[in-house]
Amino acid sequence: MEQSEKTLDMIVNLCKNRGYVFPGSEIYGGLANSWDYGPLGVEFKNNVKKAWLKKFVQESPYNVGLDAAIIMNPQTWITTGHVAGFSDPLLDCRACKARHRADKLIGDEHPEVNVDAMSFDEMDQFIAAHEDIVCPVCGKHDFTPIRKFNLMFKTAIGVTEDSSSTCYLRPETAQGIFVNFANIQRTTRRKLPFGVCQVGKAFRNEITPGNFTFRTREFEQMECEFFCKPGTDLEWFAYWKDYCENWLLSLGIQKEHLRLRDHEPAELAFYSRATTDIEYAFPFTDWGELWGIADRTNYDLSRHQEASGKSLEYFDSETNEHYIPYV
């Protein structure tokens, strides 16, 4: 067993024995990657959330709070592209039938490769050309072609289950903020720039969850969407990068365990001007994303305005012009 695995096992055992975290529904054999926070775990988690809300809402002169619904109108997720394209690259081992994420297999064996910039076809070709990429279960290099696996949990609202009653558990907390932009701006009378923050649960049907509580199908996000005038976005992007990093350091995280990784142009979404991940040196991997900061321009608000037919423009009284804010 590698030292990183020993370290993680020690953390898991400590959390179980001290009442921080228990396996979910343990008396029935548990549920894979489901965890319940015990008495100390609840206090610990609440302290982190309170510290975040204090720093990002109460102490910030720019931000306000929100608690949006977990189940939203399904058109929300059609508009954002989640229904059609929120997916992981799934493949099967032909030898043992185990299922894996293709990007994870490539990244584990070839960390020097930028998997995030690869298409599904490019991943297929890369795996076929590298026989050192084998199934972690049986050790064979024999995989099916990659296919898309949608990560959203589907459910139904009402007494009948048909296409008209289909809804989804939200896979992220950001969209609840975007669809409420006009409501918040109107009722608070805020002028740009301002942000909206919320803490809430999100759900993703991950193919290969794992590593204790660090990758689960049910999790909480601490989200801030900051709205600003176009042309000032990169300045605010730099501001919030520093703000987020400084808050993490204020919690007692050692600086050498954090790093900021700017996304390469090939990694960026077509609507993004810049993205930076704050990565942490987890005990089970070299580095992993802890926090993502992105300049999303006006993409989200523009999409929702177009699909809903409702104006999400902001009137700037200083310049006497209407525009859709950048985020």
Regions found by a protein language model. Name each.
Residues 2-327:
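TRNA-recognition modules of translation machinery and tRNA-sensing kinases, especially anticodon-binding
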